[in-house]
A protein has these predicted regions:
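Non-transmembrane, solvent-exposed beta-strand/loop segments in proteins
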Residues: 24-233
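Classical eukaryotic N-terminal signal peptides for Sec-dependent ER targeting/secretion
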Residues: 1-22
């Protein structure tokens, strides 16, 4: 994402894992009783703490994107944004036959009742308060596809110096998202789009302007090392 300073001619490059926000809702033709029965059947033996399996028993594929709602600030090496975080995946435990429930194509379920991917902004400067807002809903389709769009207020570490701005006329910031506990064997993350999308009514910033964007997917191996210091009493 390129950000240009409106008063100093400064460009900023901002790399994100993805951006999108488009929800397609099918026409609801069933009755309340159909939805009530479907709700009970789907969640009766459902285990929300167990991740769904992907195709052929492989990892569940999570499509992840961001949608910028407001560009609040870039100061003190911190980029502050208001975003809608779009996530979608398939959970085969949440499938149903259309003909059995009044042709219900979708069902709205509280997000706290179903499995959610533990995807975090890894270079956030804020204290961790939870993976997602439990009072938001997910949209479940009859084929098991799930769409979840929580609202985020993110503060991301973006190191830069005024000398580098004057010398290179740009700043490079990255938003890095990944699963906190899953490896690629159980959860595979994909970016839906290669560019960042913005809400048409996005609140602009007085000093900076977004002029270009980019999204990348990277596969990395993470090695966790523990160091302990022991002193004699």
């Amino acid at each position: 994402m390129y950000l240009v300073s409106l008063d100093a001619g400064t460009n900023m490059y901002f790399k994100v894992t993805g951006i999108l926000l488009t929800i397609t809702v099918g026409l609801v033709t069933g009755s309340f009783l159909d939805r009530k029965d479907l709700f009970k059947i789907l969640l009766r033996d459902y285990q929300k703490d167990l991740a769904p399996a992907g195709k052929g028993g492989g990892p569940v594929v999570v499509y992840h994107s961001l949608f910028v709602n407001a560009f609040e600030s870039l100061e003190n090496n911190v980029l502050t944004l208001q975003t809608w975080e779009w996530m979608s995946w398939n959970d085969n435990r949440l499938q149903w036959d259309l003909g059995s429930y009044g042709d219900e194509k979708t069902l709205i379920i509280p997000s706290k009742l179903v499995w959610q991917p533990d995807i975090l902004l890894m270079n956030s400067v804020e204290q961790f308060t939870g993976f997602a807002a439990g009072d938001l809903n997910v949209l479940v389709y009859h084929d098991g596809n799930v769409t979840f769009v929580p609202i985020r207020h993110s503060k991301t570490l973006c190191p830069f110096s005024m000398e580098s701005i004057y010398r290179e006329n740009e700043v490079n910031c990255s938003l890095k998202y990944m699963s906190w506990t899953h490896s690629s064997k159980t959860l595979d993350t994909h970016s839906t789009f290669q560019t960042v999308q913005h809400l048409s009514q996005m609140t602009p910033n007085r000093l900076w302007e977004i002029v270009d964007t980019k999204a990348e997917r990277n596969a990395i191996d993470v090695l966790v090392l523990q160091h302990r210091s022991i002193s004699r009493n």
